[in-house]
Amino acid sequence: VRTIRCVPLSIPYQGLLEVQGECIMRLSTLEAYNKTADEPLKNARNAAAGALRNLDPAVTARRKLDAFFYQIGTIENPPYHDLDGMIAFLQENGFPTSRYEAHATTYDEIVQRIDAVEAQRESLDFLIDGAVVKVCDLQTRQAMGNTEKFPRWAVAYKFAAEENTATLLDVTWELGRTGKLTPLAHLTPTDIGGVTVKRATLNNFGDIQRKRLLLGCTVWIRRSNDVIPEITGRVEDGSTGSEIAKPTVCPACGAPLVERGANLYCVNRQTCRPQAVARLAHFAGRDAMDITSLSEKTAGQLYDLCGVRDPADLYHLTREQLLSLEGFQDKRADNLLAALQKSRDCALDAFLFAIGIPNIGRGTARDVAGHFGALAGVMNATQEELLEIPDVGDIVAQSVVEFFSFPEDRTMVERLLAAGVTPREIAKPSAD
């Protein structure tokens, strides 16, 4: 964040202060960057997010990011009582704020203000997908409070997504780490909001049938929230085409597919390369076991050259095996072995996320770990016990129970434990 030049490195205010804002890459900055970049960036949102996640501050600095600040979360003795005062305080301390603000006291005025923002949307030098309506008075905000996820004193209004038409050329099937196949639509290039769209997502084969899609037909394309292109339906223009075949075997390994609910799955976990490699890379990720030097490319080499088929195999790798990989010399091999050793002592929530339980993100893994305290409790939990956890619903509870009931998954976990991986238990608060 220190590489974002508009963020002040020192401020006049003395005391504890937490400010909240949003990082952006201006469209003009993106255009200038792409003129000289070896690998042009696809869009400003991804460019900003990727820059902040990058471990090299020099890469972040080259993106020339900006930021807008809009909220103070924590402050000692705030010298203001409403939003106007808060924004003025931010400005006085050198934090850039948005100039696109307006007051309203009636519903009609709110609609007018939103329409005015939308009218300026195309002329802005940064991407927006809506406008936020907020209560100004801070005491009123405090009285209204918050839900588990959102403040009750603010609501985001999303603009209608931009749409265009394209011809559906082909449908291929992408394989994820869980073995689920997801259809990917290939389209004639079409411009939506300044972005050339050539591919779009479909949910499953049932989605293809519901939308009556055919190869060669004209379809509506929408970029939801200006980010993810999706096919919303077929254009009723009399266009015809050929049926889209439902796959019966895995496109990667040729194994028979099975249906689970609305989705198709390849159950060949061990020798289906794409899902095995994706599973290894996920296991090693920063939010999972945080095994540095183990990228998806390295996972692919480990699969091809070292016989690594699931995460437990990682802990049996030798230095000699690593030195046989492309790009690995003594230091990198030693670093990976050290990272593997370090990962043996891991947080329970990180472990639960790393093993790839479907529908379990890091936040849910943290909730589940905190509730049960130990891996054994999670592995033997019933659906009813899981439903006692706030924010855990039927789908998540069923996913956990099914994961540990599958012999392949349970065996993988047991092999990890046998290899010395030890998820730390969490002390649960006493009943009294």
Language model features with spans:
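Helix-hairpin-helix/helix-loop-helix acidic hairpins
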Residues: 375-379
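Short, solvent-exposed loop/turn elements at beta->coil junctions and helix N-caps
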Residues: 427-431
